[in-house]
């Protein structure tokens, strides 16, 4: 009793709650024990901790232990014996129902145990029917194992007990020691006996006799350990006692060590308990000697895996327990503890002769052998069990051999050898600290419950494994008979042994340090095993079976290893028995991992084990698998041979020396193992791969599977046959149990070995060594390994691996991570592991790889393989070029992907091809980089754009788009509402607010579209807006009646103090009355305010000046409203607005002090600064809703002020909502300082970059607003002229995304808008024209359809009736005329083609001519249509300009190249278009402002001429100046033209500047600076003098006069005077011409009709001159007269023979020539004409400025459509503007000069006009529309 108490007090492993009961029970048991009390003081101490743990973990166990203690100590041993059988058959039932047997029964059973011991040599039938002849221990082992049969891996008693306890008792207990387990087991047994007395009794009877001897020996060593209480505790745990004879003794000896470990067992895995149990058997105690199945074993018997954190004692506890157990074990098992004895025992056990083993150590060996002989499978399983339990576990193994071996794939052949070896290893280790360490591994081994499942799993796996059974790898250590289906062929397995032998040599040196690891018994045996394996490895390919056999003989640890092995061996177990021999040899390699390390199994068994254990220690358990892998790769090859992974040859060649310690695929095994067996067993490289040198790279993989299993065996051996091997096999659940304890030791010992194996297996050097293999391995090996892994995993291995390994994987995460590196055996086992880099990814536990190759293989093998493949391929060197490219520091000669992004979303890509080139004398190929295939693809195929559910219906042209637009807006709103806030915006406090406001902005636009742009007059629109601004309001207010509203207020009124002040003070009212009596209303008001009589004050103030009223309201708001509550900002602002304090209303939301950055403290409310003064911004919705629901006169100003306030605080969307609803917002360009909105949702005032202006959503939303306010609202004018440029940007973005058809539609829409606008804007500048033209041209080039070019226009014309257009042109006589009259587009096409030809020939002259001709024609028609058609003219001009853009688009290729040069061409080809462009910019303003707007339009023509001159100038070089100027102007949209030119300097007609000022307002200031300069001067002068006169005469006449006048300006500085004279002449000539033409029109019906209406020739004949007053008859008669008119080619006009004045206009041409030369100069930028122009331009400039684009617009009217495109750039030339009209003569006369003269003459005379029309008669027709001679002139 004293000892037990001491033990209890001494054992730290006991848990506090268990210490008392367990101590009592153990004390009783110790007292009852014969020798155990004295011998097992240490053991008891150690055992009692385990008992405490058991009790602590399982409360019922304590209680049962107490019962069993009360029953008697002797019963415990008997009961233990009974438990042994029970563990076999009824371990599950016992575990499940431990309490069923009565205490008496348990006692009786305990009493039977001595009998079992006595019957050690007798055959004892177990409940399972197993009969063991050798010894009671063996019999009991068989019996115990029979229950374990379902769980072959649950060989460690402690682990099993713990697992059982965990599973059934709900407590997670780590059996620190066998003794501890026994003491607890006594309680458990007592409990179990209570639960199932009959069963235990039977088993006890059978096993008692067989186990009495063994248990007696154990009792002699450690009586307290085997005391009945411990046995009872075990039984209570539900763990049957394992009756082990000699094996039990060895186990007890190991248990002693395990018990030392068990001190730390609470911290360690159940393996510590297992080891302690093993050590206790080494002790002489009978009861303690009786090895009870560990919880894991019992669970294994139940085929249940218990994963309890307590099941595995901490490594330190296991070590401590082992240390304690070792001394006790030394008493009886000193031989076993000695390494020599251990080696002998192992050899005896390994040899299939059980009789050879000594009774103590020999007895253990004999028992092991007997057990092995009896049941190879059982021995294998028992070996696993023994790994955890130790020699006692060997008995368990026997039972397991009987039952569980059948289940475990590798039970029969190899298990017997292993269990024996492990007990021996445990015995030698027990005496030393290695025993303690072994105890820790034992705890790791304690993961037997897992092993149980694994065994069952392996049983399931057995069928598939048979083919590749590697029984030899594991089982053959102890017995060759066992073979695992995963084992490589015998050839491979044997070479592994040989390698193992070599490893043994290597490992032994390394093992020298291992003795410390040896502290954990397991590490040492692995060393022995490793010593043995080298021989098998060496003989791996030759005779794997025999070498494995030797290896196993050397390795006592393999028995413990079966547990871990079942996990890994589960793969091999299937065909362990017969087929295993050859394949098992592959399987032995798993054992070999440890055996390989030992090298010579038998000879080195004893001593080598400890050193080898230390070898693993040398490797850091947590050391990187990759790093160790490299050094250990050689070892891996040796071991690998056994596994025959791809590395057999490779590994051997690569790292055979290092590999001995591990079982990396040995080179020999590589040869044979490289064959299918490795594949079958592992997903390792194919046999050929392993054989290949390249396999060396993958050798880690090949060897890694082998090494992994060998490691498992090695660990088992090194760890006293404890589950340490399982630990390398960390995958299996047994590993999990054993890992906690093993990992420390196994990490040190086995872990390093595994690391070595991994190193050997995946040696980086190996890969490099066989570069060819790298390429081969990546593909072949990867596929091979994947296939192998798949079969292995898919087969029974998968079941076991999945069931067991996966648990290990689960557990390994916490343990394997550190183990993973040390115990990368899994990595070494699987070819994947050979890939170090992959393994880290594959193995979450460790960066280097999964702890278990099996696990890794199953889940990761496929992925790792590709990764591996890639890595090797990357290692290959490139063949450097010899042409100097090799000096490129960027090494571009190696090749790189090349991408080129083209127009229309096209992407051209080219990837380099890396071709391996082999050369003589090189093992690895070298890479030759060659260009790959060039592919053309669409960007959308690579980066598909995020398209909404609904596609945008743009461009928005008609009302039919409304429905689609609403649907698109709704889809976008839904997307915004469901989208998450970007991460980069989440830091912003206003991110959520901005998101809501953005959604609200889109909703407002949707309401605007739904209500056709009208919000004020519609009740539905008002309701919709209210619901948006107040989503929570909805119908809450309508649901309340007025009565309801007043009722509550009435009830609250008595409580409302504010209502009282008005009537509270009667004296104040009297004073007020007196003041009013005196007539001092203002004084009365402020008195009432002071007295807070607000009603009085407001009534009186309402009769006074508004300022007083506003002040009163302001005071009321500040003193009453603002202080009432905290949310009155919106109400206060609204009252301010009602009072008329519009600008001050925002002060109620955000005080000025806050806007100034100050924080004011209120002295009244006392709130201080608690409130954020900026919170008032959040009231903007309420304020907006109040204002919209209660409109007041100036509330729009208040909304604008509110919007500006919000904008200042970066609340852009909210500000834009206020702007939109105010209806007073200004939309404009970025350069407009007055613009409130440029794009909806974009703050143009705070642009960090221009990227925001390219946002498609903002552009499209703004387009939707424009659509709602213009198209849907019925407005014919675009309200947002600046938006065209953004639409062009959007069109470009569409083209970039490959949506070219939509981009073309936008181009067409922009061109149509430019033509349709009646009031050109400064934003309609040359850049816009050129941009549209260029994009259209590129789209036409990349698409088959016509696009928006002039070609498409004819097609459009065809749609409208191209035949009629041709017929009309034919009837009219001039196709160009008809074209121009019929439709600017078609007309321009024909004439343009002609004109373009001329300009093409000579751009400068042709431009002048063209512009001149067009201007003339345009001037004539425009004048005719000018007033009525002026806007249309400007509209026409724009259309013309686009048309000309298109017409010139035929020349787009030239123009598109660059604006400068193309402009020249375009101008040359179409000068009129340039004028048109000018008109678009300035014409309208000029027209609008000056009465002579039409004439201004004519001057703009002259400006067009300047544009043409610009083109010409560009040719001459002078144009560049103007053009560049123009460019600058265009950049500044409004003033692009004028600014370009120096018209302002020319602006000598400062008088006109006043005019310009007038027109300037029209332009809005865009063009004023620039456009004014160039175009206005001429137009201004013409407007000033001739314009008035011309207007008096006729609009058209005025135009010609203007032109002539301007031509004069163009000609020279005298041009002004000449212009005046010419204008007078022109007026007269025009009048005469009108008359003559009228007559001619009457005479010639053809000419009049087309000119008049531009309709059909019929209309021309019949109604062409109807405007003039010509009748059908008179027309015919006049037609004859018209014959008097002839076209003078020199004058380029019609000359009336009858009218001598007709020739005079021709004379007028000379002045223009003078001017024309200068104009061209002016165009070119020459000073001469510009001065002339300059004089007018100033006037024009000023005039143009007024119109902002005034100068240009006039020109537009002057030469409407044709010049617009080309003209815009030339717009700069001022003289030309005048000359432009005149240019018609230029064709006949020299370039520009003819224009002015011609234009003057033409303008002044009908002939001139007619001449111009011939050049381009379109304008003439237009003039005719005006009802003038235009038609005749055109003809």
From Swiss-Prot:
Signal peptide: none
Record-linked InterPro entries: Sec16_CCD (IPR024340), Sec16_N (IPR024468), Sec16_Sec23-bd (IPR024298)
Topology of the protein relative to the lipid bilayer: Peripheral membrane protein
Bias (Basic and acidic residues): 138-148, 473-482, 708-724, 1588-1606, 1623-1656
Ranges that cross the membrane: none
Compartments reported by the entry: Endoplasmic reticulum membrane
Function: Involved in the initiation of assembly of the COPII coat required for the formation of transport vesicles from the endoplasmic reticulum (ER) and the selection of cargo molecules. Also involved in autophagy.
Protein name: COPII coat assembly protein sec16
Taxonomic source organism: Neosartorya fischeri (strain ATCC 1020 / DSM 3700 / CBS 544.65 / FGSC A1164 / JCM 1740 / NRRL 181 / WB 181) (Aspergillus fischerianus)
Classification of source organism: Eukaryota, Fungi, Dikarya, Ascomycota, Pezizomycotina
Gene name per UniProt: sec16
